Structure formats: C-alpha cells, structure tokens
Amino acid sequence: MRKVKADCSDSTGRKEMHGAFWRDQALHDIMPAWLAHGINPASERFYTGLSRDWKPIGTTDQYPTMLGRHLFSLSAAYLLSGEERYLRLAKTTASYLIEHGWDHEFGG
C-alpha cells in the first residue's frame, strides 16, 4: 500500500492569497472592460454575445443566468469600491431580471 503525503507550503508571499489582488483584478482589469464594451448604451443592458475584440455578435436576447452573473459582478464591484455607478447598474439589472425573468406560468 502506498502512502499519500500531503504538504502545504508557505503561500503567504503569493499575491493570489491576498484580497487586494482580487479586488484589483475586479476593479482595474475586469469591470472597466465590461463597462466600456459590454453594455449597450441605448438600453443599458448587457450584450448577450461579444467577439474577442468586444464587438456585439449574435442574438440580443437577455438570459436570466447571464443577467444573474452580471448582477453578482456589479454588486461585488460596488461592495469592493463603493462606486455608485456599480450600484446603479446593479439596480437596473436586478429590476430588469425581476420584471422579465420571472416565469408567471410556472412561478419561478
């Protein structure tokens, strides 16, 4: 029978282990790109499909799972930064999701 050895090295020096790394990723790398390219300025709704160079492609249908992910991201960005623009977009997304994402026929 072989023995399995588990070892945890000291990872305190790794940047991925610190909250500032993830906050900076969200607020400086991820959210600015989505705010600049991922939202249709006419409707303030997220594009459903984007090409690798951030050009809208495909359908314009809004899917609850997609909207839920955006709502989570916007809410997290607001909690991390306190910036009102994230809160405003989160509220807009939540309202749209509640209004259009509810299945009145089956109650969910």
List PLM regions with ranges:
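Glycan-recognition and catalytic cores of secretory/periplasmic carbohydrate-active enzymes
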Residues: M1-G108
